[in-house]
C-alpha cells in the first residue's frame, strides 16, 4: 500500500509539473521554415519549373530528326502502262525528316523556352514570399487579438474591483443601486468586447493551423520582430538593386519571353529547309524539301497577338515596380510613425493610470461621481488598446517591408538553392 501511495503521489506531482510547464513557443520563423519548402503552393511552383524545363527540351528537339514507321496498302489503282501497277500487299517502310535550316526560328523558340523556365524559377521564389507574407499576416493578427484580449481582461478586472467596492456600499445604502447597475453595465460591455476578440482569435488560429501539423495555441505566439530594430531591418534586409525582387524578376523574364515569342513567330513565316527520306523493301529515296507559307492569315494575327502581349507585359512590369517602390516607402513611413506613437501612448497610459487612481480616491470621499471613474477607466483601456494596435501596425509594417524587398525567406533563415527536381 505504501508503494502504491508513493507512486500515486509521484504521478500527481509529475502531472502537476507538466501542467504548469510553459507551452513551447511557436515562432513565426519556425512556421515559415516548415512551409516555405514543403507547402503545396511551393511544390506546385516547383512542378511548374520542371514543366518549363521539359518544354525547353521540346523546343531543342526540333533540331533532331523525326523517324516514323509506316505501312501502306493500295486499295485501287489505274495505270495506262501495266508495268506501273504495284502490289496490293501492305508495304512496311520508314520515314525520316530533319530540319536543315529555319532562319533561326528554332533557336529563338529555344531561347523563349529558356526564358519561360527562368520566369517560373522567379515565380517559385515569389510564391514563397507570397506564402510567407500570408502566414506572417495571420500570425501577427492572432498575436494582436491575444494582446487585445489581455488589455480587456485587465479592464474587466478593474471593473470587477469597482463592483466589489460598490457591493459593500450597497449593503449599507440601497439608494446607490443605480451606480451598481451602471458599473455592471460597463463591465458587461467589456466582457462582450473580450468575446468578440476571442472569436476573431479562434478564427485566425484555425486558419493559421492549416500551415502547421497541429493546432496552434494562442499562448505560444511571440513577437517575431522584438529583436529587429528598424535600422537593422534596413541594413540587413534591403535590396541594393530593386530589380532583384523575385516578383519583379518574374515580370522581367515574362516580358523577355514574350519578346522572344514574337521574334520566333516572325521567323516561322520564313522558308524552312528539311532533309526528308523514306525507305521500303522495294524503294529508297532521300531529298531536300523547302516549305514556305506564302499565305497564312492566322500567322498574321498570331504576330499581332504577340505584340499586344508584349505591350501588356511591359505595363505590368512598370506597375509591379511602382507598387513595390510605393509599398516600401509606405512601410518605412508607418514604421517611423508607429515608433513615435508608441512613445506617446506609453506616456498617455501612465497618465491615465494616475487619473484612474485619483478618481477612485476622490469617489471614495464623494468628490467624484462613479461616471467620472468609469470614463477614466474607459480612457485608460482605450489608450492600452491603442498601444497594442500600434505595436501590431509596427510589426505589420516590418513584414510589409520584408515583402517589398523579397526578403521574407532570407529573414526566416531559408536560403535560395538551385532547383533540382525530376517529377515522374
Language model feature labels by segment:
Residues 33-43, 50-66, 94-112, 122-129, ...:
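A glycine-/polar-enriched beta->alpha junction
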Residues 2-10:
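Bacterial N-terminal signal peptides that target proteins for export
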Residues 2-3, 24, 216, 388-424:
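Acidic, low-complexity, intrinsically disordered peripheral segments
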Residues 2-3, 26, 30, 127-244, ...:
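Periplasmic alpha-helical coiled-coil/stalk elements that build and connect Gram-negative outer-membrane
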Residues 44-59, 127, 131-154, 161, ...:
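Amphipathic alpha-helical coiled-coil segments
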Residues 10-19:
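Bacterial N-terminal signal peptides
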Residues 70-100, 109, 221-232, 267, ...:
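Small/polar, glycine/serine/threonine/aspartate-rich low-complexity segments that form flexible
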Residues 23-68, 174-177, 209-259, 321, ...:
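Bacterial Sec-pathway N-terminal export signals of envelope proteins
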Amino acid at each position: 500500500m505504501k508503494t502504491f501511495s508513493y507512486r500515486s503521489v509521484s504521478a500527481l506531482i509529475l502531472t502537476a509539473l507538466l501542467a504548469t510547464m510553459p507551452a513551447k513557443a511557436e515562432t513565426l520563423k519556425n512556421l515559415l521554415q516548415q512551409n516555405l519548402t514543403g507547402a503545396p503552393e511551393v511544390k506546385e511552383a516547383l512542378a511548374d519549373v520542371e514543366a518549363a524545363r521539359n518544354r525547353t527540351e521540346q523546343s531543342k528537339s526540333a533540331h533532331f530528326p523525326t523517324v516514323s514507321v509506316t505501312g501502306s496498302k493500295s486499295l485501287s489503282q489505274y495505270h495506262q502502262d501495266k508495268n506501273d501497277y504495284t502490289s496490293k500487299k501492305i508495304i512496311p517502310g520508314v520515314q525520316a525528316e530533319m530540319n536543315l535550316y529555319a532562319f533561326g526560328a528554332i533557336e529563338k523558340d529555344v531561347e523563349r523556352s529558356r526564358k519561360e523556365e527562368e520566369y517560373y524559377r522567379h515565380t517559385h521564389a515569389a510564391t514563397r514570399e507570397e506564402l510567407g507574407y500570408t502566414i506572417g499576416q495571420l500570425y501577427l493578427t492572432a498575436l494582436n487579438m491575444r494582446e487585445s484580449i489581455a488589455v480587456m481582461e485587465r479592464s474587466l478586472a478593474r471593473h470587477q474591483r469597482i463592483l466589489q467596492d460598490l457591493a459593500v456600499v450597497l449593503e449599507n445604502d440601497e439608494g446607490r443601486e443605480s451606480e451598481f447597475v451602471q458599473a455592471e453595465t460597463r463591465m458587461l460591455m467589456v466582457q462582450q468586447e473580450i468575446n468578440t476578440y476571442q472569436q476573431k482569435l479562434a478564427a485566425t488560429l484555425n486558419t493559421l493551423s492549416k500551415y502547421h501539423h497541429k493546432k496552434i495555441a494562442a499562448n505560444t505566439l511571440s513577437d517575431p520582430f522584438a529583436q529587429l530594430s528598424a535600422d537593422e531591418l534596413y541594413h540587413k534586409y534591403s535590396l541594393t538593386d530593386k530589380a532583384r525582387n523575385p516578383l519583379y524578376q518574374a515580370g522581367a523574364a515574362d516580358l523577355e519571353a514574350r519578346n522572344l515569342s514574337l521574334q520566333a513567330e516572325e521567323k516561322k513565316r520564313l522558308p524552312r529547309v528539311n532533309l526528308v527520306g523514306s525507305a521500303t523493301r522495294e524503294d529508297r529515296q532521300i531529298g531536300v524539301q523547302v516549305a514556305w507559307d506564302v499565305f497564312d492569315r492566322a500567322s498574321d494575327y498570331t504576330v499581332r497577338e504577340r505584340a499586344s502581349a508584349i505591350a501588356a507585359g511591359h505595363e505590368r512590369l512598370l506597375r509591379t515596380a511602382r507598387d513595390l517602390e510605393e509599398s516600401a516607402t509606405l512601410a518605412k513611413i508607418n514604421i517611423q510613425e508607429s515608433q513615435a506613437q508608441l512613445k506617446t501612448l506609453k506616456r498617455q497610459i501612465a497618465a491615465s493610470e494616475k487619473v484612474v487612481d485619483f478618481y477612485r480616491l476622490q469617489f471614495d470621499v464623494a468628490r467624484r461621481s462613479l461616471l467620472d471613474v468609469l470614463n477614466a477607466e474607459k480612457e485608460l483601456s482605450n489608450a492600452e488598446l491603442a498601444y497594442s494596435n500600434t505595436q501590431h501596425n509596427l510589426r505589420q509594417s516590418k513584414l510589409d517591408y520584408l515583402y517589398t524587398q523579397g526578403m521574407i525567406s532570407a529573414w526566416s533563415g531559408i536560403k535560395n538553392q538551385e532547383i533540382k527536381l525530376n517529377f515522374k
